[in-house]
A protein has these predicted regions:
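Hydrophobic alpha-helical segments
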Residues: 52-103
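Structural signal for membrane-spanning alpha-helices in multi-pass inner-membrane proteins
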Residues: 36, 40, 95, 105-108
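Membrane-helix interface segments in multi-pass membrane proteins
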Residues: 31-74, 129-137, 141-165
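Membrane-interface extramembranous regions at the lipid-water interface
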Residues: 1-28, 73-90, 104-134, 154, ...
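Hydrophobic alpha-helical membrane-insertion segments
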Residues: 28-34, 95-100
Length: 165
């Protein structure tokens, strides 16, 4: 039972391999995107047009709490990924440094973890649903790129033609 609790993705102790890290971040993104979509349907009167550009204080507090939760869980996943690389969790603060965060993210996504036990425990096996989620993510990224690149090229051509006229 305690192994299951320690292996929970919501706990900072333990390790995340690359696939687990991507899958849990994707799951987090889906959760918060779903919250946003539900909120948009429940609170249609809270749009900027109906509020004359002013946001109500309770809504602002709720949004700050939601963003705070998203950042908190992202840092938890980041710490677990750093543990897989046998690095201290304090390195996760690099994610808040502009430009460094881009290189740091690439490092975490591309660098393999340690196959043996390290200071932070044994390697965590990637669960089947995590692998499935990563494959889904890659398929969606390829499909999105297949539509986005030609659409962007079309936009650039139209913008150049408009400048010439």
């Amino acid at each position: 039972m305690s192994n299951t609790i320690q292996d929970s993705g919501w706990n900072a102790s333990g390790r995340f391999g690359r696939r687990s890290y991507i899958a849990w971040n994707m799951l987090l993104g889906f959760c918060f995107m779903s919250i946003g979509i539900i909120a948009a349907f429940i609170l249609p009167g809270m749009s900027p047009e109906t509020l004359d550009g002013k946001m109500s204080m309770p809504l602002m507090v709720v949004l700050v709490l939601i963003y705070g939760l998203a950042i908190y869980f992202s840092v938890i996943f980041l710490i677990r990924r750093l543990h897989d690389r046998n690095h201290n969790g304090w390195l996760s603060l690099l994610i808040f440094v502009p430009v460094v965060n881009l290189v740091f993210t690439l490092y975490l996504l591309l660098a393999p973890g340690h196959n043996e036990s390290n200071d932070y425990g044994s390697p965590r096996t990637t669960r089947g649903w995590e692998t499935l989620l990563v494959v889904l993510y890659l398929v969606l990224a390829v499909i999105l790129a297949a539509f986005a690149v030609p659409a962007y090229q079309n936009y650039v051509e139209r913008a150049q033609q408009a400048q010439m006229e």
